[in-house]
A protein has these predicted regions:
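TPR-repeat structural position
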Residues: 63, 147-148
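Short, charge/polar-rich alpha-helical segments
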Residues: 116-126
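Short amphipathic alpha-helical heptad-repeat segments
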Residues: 124-136
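Extended, low-complexity, charged alpha-helical tracts
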Residues: 135-145
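Short, charged, amphipathic alpha-helical segments
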Residues: 150-159
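Short, charge-rich amphipathic alpha-helical segments embedded
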Residues: 159-175
Length: 178
């Protein structure tokens, strides 16, 4: 036992249980805090919720993973009024917080949200090239106002889809030679 009478094993068990409950709760969220039925986000409510979650996570020593789960949740947001994803409130928040963990969560969620794709013979990476162009365009449009989001999130998405497009193009070329 420690000098203060507490048992480290009990404290570690409690921390693990708390973390598991937090991750379950974050993983179970299906709507972004502050989001109404139309998908419009009350930025003040979202910022307050995120700050409270990060502050609590910081106290419990699990900020990185909580930021990641918050990012996964934010990855569900709609396009903004300007047509750019993520919406204005989310991109402002992520730009301010500057968390690579949050970016990673958003990236994973956005990639996973695409689901299964199918293609006709000869398509190659045409689908992915269109996605690359979209993310590159959005990244250019946000480069001045939201450089972190533009580069770290939209640039990463464009790069990963570019890699996938090249893979499908290579596969198509191989099929044509068989």
């Amino acid at each position: 036992k420690r000098d203060d009478g507490k048992d480290d094993r009990d404290e570690n068990t409690n921390k693990k249980e708390f973390r598991a409950k937090c991750f379950d709760a974050l993983g179970a969220l299906s709507h972004i805090p502050g989001e109404d039925n139309s998908g419009k986000i009350n930025t003040e409510k979202l910022e307050e919720w995120v700050q409270q979650a990060i502050n609590l996570a910081e106290k419990k020593g699990c900020r990185n993973i909580v930021e990641y789960f918050i990012g996964k949740l934010l990855g569900h947001c709609q396009n903004g009024e300007d047509g750019i994803w993520p919406c204005e409130g989310v991109r402002d928040l992520v730009e301010d917080i500057h968390s690579k963990n949050m970016i990673e969560g958003m990236y994973i969620e956005k990639r996973n949200s695409r689901g299964v794709t199918s293609r006709s013979f000869g398509d190659g990476g045409a689908q992915e090239w269109r996605i690359v162009e979209q993310y590159q365009d959005w990244s250019r449009q946000l480069a001045i106002t939201h450089p972190f989001v533009a580069d770290e999130l939209l640039g990463w998405l464009a790069s990963s889809y570019k890699h996938e497009a090249e893979m499908w193009d290579d596969e198509h070329r191989l099929d044509m030679h068989l």
